[in-house]
Amino acid sequence: MDSSCRTPPSNSWVYPTVILCLFGFFSMFRPSEAFLIPFLSEPSKNLTSPEMTNEILPVWTYSYLATLPPVFVLTDYLRYKPVIMLHVVAFATSYLFLLFGQGVMLMQTAEFFFGVVSATEIAYFAYIYSMVSPEHYQKVSSYCRSITLVAYTAGSVLAQLLVSLTNLPYSSLFYISLACVSVAFFFSLFLPMPKKSMFFHAKSDRDDCPKPLEQCTVPKEAQSNRTHSELFANSKNLEDREMSNPDPENSALRHFAHWFQDLKECYSSKHLVYWSLWWAFATAGYNQILNYVQVLWEHKAPSQDSSIYNGAVEAIATFGGALASFSVGYLKVNWDLLGELGLAVFSAVIAGSLFLMNYSRSIWVCYAGYLLVKSSYSFLITIAVFQIAVNLSLERYALVFGIDTFIALVIQTIMTMIVVDQRGLQLPVTTQFLVYGSYFAVIAGVFLMRSIYILCSAKCRKEVQNLATTRSPNEPHPQEPSNVSTKF
């Protein structure tokens, strides 16, 4: 039997996981993140609030949208590692522009590279799945995600301590972040180059392995929802399609056609569609909040005139979000029945928090509202990820995640062009948060109506079932109207 199909040693996953976690820690240890707007507001940069809000920050959204599609494809085609290295190079380039650049144009260039950073982040989370066997997926996912939360929290705490206790200039925080990103690049050099990837380079593993497909390339979550005969038949059909069209030039077309068919099958589920819609719309609004909340804080309490606690707030918010996400695993809830109601309730909490942040003059109320927003979103997005991924293989989950993220970026771009951009309405930051609050209120209203429909339908079905079980076996059953459907 080919050695490529043998069970890997029990410690074969340890080395790439450790290196990737070290990379993740230093790439996410960014003390500068919480003090970007105060830094740009300093006399040395001499940027006004309208320039930052309406001219500089929107570039991140446009750059993220423009670079995500090619990055999504190239990440898999290049097998992750080169894109991981590009991730930190873009980070370093952005920090260099922020530190040494002057004027709106160079700050826009820095935001462009921040967009590249955001787009290439997918390589960090996708890399490890190409290096370890499926039985380690849950463990390594936990490590890789947890280390980024720890690093971001630690960076925010350090930044707050340095600013509050030593009066360290904001620029020094960016030098620290630049040094950490450089260390992350050093660790990226030691990442093993994957021999396979999720889509483009998966065929080599099938060719090298005479076992059925489910033993080599299909994740366990996919196996739990298919029979062995179905998996073997699917693998045989896939091989037949590849053999019938051996031209290398058509390989990309085959992959894209296969992706399209997978997406068509995935989105045929109404349940997945509704959760994906919430994911896309809520993520678009949430990203807008993250992008402009520091501008709102600067408006409520200018950093030149008062003490600010952005770092402490970011640390607490990140920790609160982690706790909210962690709590999802211990909730015993019928999400099929009550999931949309949960989306409605917590979307309403986000909307109320944004209204409070807009109308209150207290910076502490703004901080508290932000904590509620971040915790509520982290709680809901964890549920959404679980609901979407529960019946999908890893490959299909990656596709759905990519499409949902792209749709969210399209929505966010439209929102930015209309609400924020100087070529649009160019609204002040306080009015923007009024718009974002109304946006989440609409989301809450839509899913509240959806949840009422689901609960009423479930109640009607239960009453019909109870009536059927209590009827005498000798009584004739009335004919059910053909135009009544209890499926939702």
UniProtKB/Swiss-Prot annotation:
One Pfam entry name: Folate_carrier
Gene Ontology, cellular component aspect: plasma membrane
Swiss-Prot/TrEMBL catalytic activity: thiamine(out) + H(+)(in) = thiamine(in) + H(+)(out)
Annotated localization: Membrane
Coiled coil: none
Any one GO molecular function term: thiamine transmembrane transporter activity
All ranges on the Extracellular side of the membrane: 30-54, 104-111, 167-172, 298-310, 357-369, 421-428
Annotated glycosylation sites: N46, N358
Region (Disordered): 469-488
GO BP of this protein: pyridoxine transport; thiamine diphosphate biosynthetic process; thiamine transmembrane transport; thiamine transport
Tissue: High expression in kidney, brain, lung and small intestine. Detected in pancreatic acinar cells (at protein level). Also expressed strongly in pancreatic islet cells.
Cytoplasmic face residues: 1-8, 76-82, 133-145, 194-276, 332-335, 391-399, 450-488
Effect upon mutating P169S: Can mediate pyridoxine transport
PANTHER family xref list: FOLATE TRANSPORTER (PTHR10686), THIAMINE TRANSPORTER 2 (PTHR10686:SF37)
Family classification: Belongs to the reduced folate carrier (RFC) transporter (TC 2.A.48) family.
Annotated protein name in UniProt: Thiamine transporter 2
Originating gene: Slc19a3
